[in-house]
Amino acid sequence: MRWFYSTNHKDIGTLYFILGVWAGMVGAGMSLLIRIELSQPGAFLGSDQLYNTIVTAHXFVMIFFLVMPVFIGGFGNWLLPLMLGAPDMAFPRLNNMSFWLLPPSLILLVSSAAVEKGAGTGWTVYPPLASNLAHAGPSVDLAIFSLHLAGASSILGAINFITTVINMRWSGLRLERIPLFVWAVLITVVLLLLSLPVLAGAITMLLTDRNLNTSFFDPAGGGDPILYQHLFWFFGHPEVYILILPGFGAISHIVSHYTAKLEPFGALGMIYAMLGIAVLGFIVWAHHMFTVGLDVDTRAYFTAVTMIIAVPTGIKVFSWLATIHGSKIKYETPVLWALGFIFLFTTGGLTGIILSNSSLDIILHDTYYVVAHFHYVLSMGAVFAIFAAFTHWFPLLTGLTLHHRWANAQFFLMFLGVNTTFFPQHFLGLSGMPRRYSDYPDAFMKWNVVSSFGSLLSFVALMLFIFILWEAFASQRSVISSPHMSSALEWSDPILPLDFHNLSETGIITYPK
């Protein structure tokens, strides 16, 4: 029962991890179904609607039930109080509620796919396809309610994290000195707090359009489906930065830890870069809508500002490289993930720069080029960062160590798998293969076969990861000590795993005058 009503940040963080791992398996299973369908021309599932329902559910599960719970809920809950020297989160019971809103939300999402014909709208849920005309029945409504719950969970969590960071720091721990992961999560939850209400408004209007005969998005009643797209992407674009920013913070910690440095190169610049990304992230949303007939000045503006986001992102990438430069790096598993992250995230960023050109995007929009782009930054950005953070902080969370050689092998297998899956999709997109179709002309077969083979490699790597987890718990190799630098506050308690309540009183940090 302790897990149900726990108000302890470590317990709740662990619950988020369990939910995230489980949902990650579900989402990975869906992605395998997608790749099996596309592994050869002709039908496998036999229905485009079913295929699109799987695509929709895959996306929602991976975004709202894997990346966000693990990074913000799992690592955020576990590490923020430790890095700030706080005894717990500011609102422990609210924290508990934030977690317990997620399982019902996940159940609603799975139900939406299971009842009637499912929500085959894609994760963007655009009307008129999502209207009661094209999607009669309760499926889309269930998906909307699922999003409402997940959004409420995130907003409550955001309030909690913001309050914790502002009020519960060690005396003397000035804002510019708090660790980069704390900054990353703080900026992330501010983005959540500002963008989720807009999504809630959009999907509530969609709900009333579907059930109460309003016409927010129906031209017949004076509405406009483009309004929905503007509202959705005003949330959707900050959302993709919400997914990656905690990863930035984690990678900063890992890179400086394994290069034996007290802090990453240009730590203050890193904070400003994240702030810059956060601000710019709110004013570029229409680059997802270059094909809907925006006028030329609007397209020019969104192209230009989207390209400007590359500047703070580039600052971060080069600062990580500068941190690594000249150091005697210890090639342990988290470093491999971090280096893989830097390389592949940069690749995804470059395809993003290409897509930010409105003229090119009109050709590439809704092709597999876009799929390849965002899977490079998510599947090899956010997910690699999760693996890096998990392998790095696993001894802190459990007091146990992972099997070194197997963890390394799992990285190389996963690296091979995701690249084999997603690199060929750039070629498919450039040849004009569209997204969200369950079948394709024979001309596209070669690269689809390669891509589907890569997905099997990734799946084996995932199973190997689950085995490595089991092996670590089964073997019980305890941590003796941590080789951390004095600036890494979360490791400062000498006894691992950390006690249920590790801080009986808060500390004080003094500075030389």
UniProtKB/Swiss-Prot annotation:
The protein's assembly and partners: Component of the cytochrome c oxidase (complex IV, CIV), a multisubunit enzyme composed of a catalytic core of 3 subunits and several supernumerary subunits. The complex exists as a monomer or a dimer and forms supercomplexes (SCs) in the inner mitochondrial membrane with ubiquinol-cytochrome c oxidoreductase (cytochrome b-c1 complex, complex III, CIII).
Organism: Lumbricus terrestris (Common earthworm)
Protein residues bound to Mg(2+): 365-366
Ranges that cross the membrane: 14-34, 60-80, 96-116, 142-162, 180-200, 231-251, 265-285, 304-324, 335-355, 377-397, 411-431, 453-473
KW Cell membrane (keyword) present: no
Residues binding Ca(2+): 37, 42
Enzyme Commission code: 7.1.1.9
Cofactor, how bound (note): Binds 2 heme A groups non-covalently per subunit. Binds a copper B center.
Domain of life: Eukaryota
Recorded name of the encoding gene: COI
Catalytic activity: 4 Fe(II)-[cytochrome c] + O2 + 8 H(+)(in) = 4 Fe(III)-[cytochrome c] + 2 H2O + 4 H(+)(out)
Membrane topology label: Multi-pass membrane protein
Swiss-Prot/TrEMBL cofactor(s): heme; Cu cation
GO biological process terms held by the UniProt record: electron transport coupled proton transport; mitochondrial electron transport, cytochrome c to oxygen
Annotated protein name in UniProt: Cytochrome c oxidase subunit 1
Amino acids binding Fe(II)-heme a: 58, 375
Localization, UniProt: Mitochondrion inner membrane
